[in-house]
Amino acid sequence: MPIITSYFGFLLTALTIASALFIGLSKIRLI
């Protein structure tokens, strides 16, 4: 169970970073 939790946390962190990068690129492209 701890392995699944840590994997889910890692996935959530990666998704958050990816979305933040995507939003940043979109803002730069809009300007």
From Swiss-Prot:
Q: Which GO terms describe its biological process?
A: photosynthesis
Question: Any S-S bridges, and between which cysteines?
Answer: none
Spell out the protein name for this chain: Cytochrome b6-f complex subunit 6
Q: Which GO terms describe its molecular function?
A: electron transporter, transferring electrons within cytochrome b6/f complex of photosystem II activity
Membrane topology type: Single-pass membrane protein
Q: Which UniProt keywords apply?
A: Chloroplast, Electron transport, Membrane, Photosynthesis, Plastid, Thylakoid, Transmembrane, Transmembrane helix, Transport
State the oligomer form and interacting partners: The 4 large subunits of the cytochrome b6-f complex are cytochrome b6, subunit IV (17 kDa polypeptide, PetD), cytochrome f and the Rieske protein, while the 4 small subunits are PetG, PetL, PetM and PetN. The complex functions as a dimer.
Q: Which family does it belong to?
A: Belongs to the PetL family.
Job of this protein: Component of the cytochrome b6-f complex, which mediates electron transfer between photosystem II (PSII) and photosystem I (PSI), cyclic electron flow around PSI, and state transitions. PetL is important for photoautotrophic growth as well as for electron transfer efficiency and stability of the cytochrome b6-f complex.
Cellular localization per UniProt: Plastid, Chloroplast thylakoid membrane
GO CC terms: chloroplast thylakoid membrane; cytochrome b6f complex
**Record field: transmembrane:** 3-23
InterPro entries (alphabetical): Cyt_b6/f_cplx_su6 (IPR007802)
Q: Which gene encodes it?
A: petL
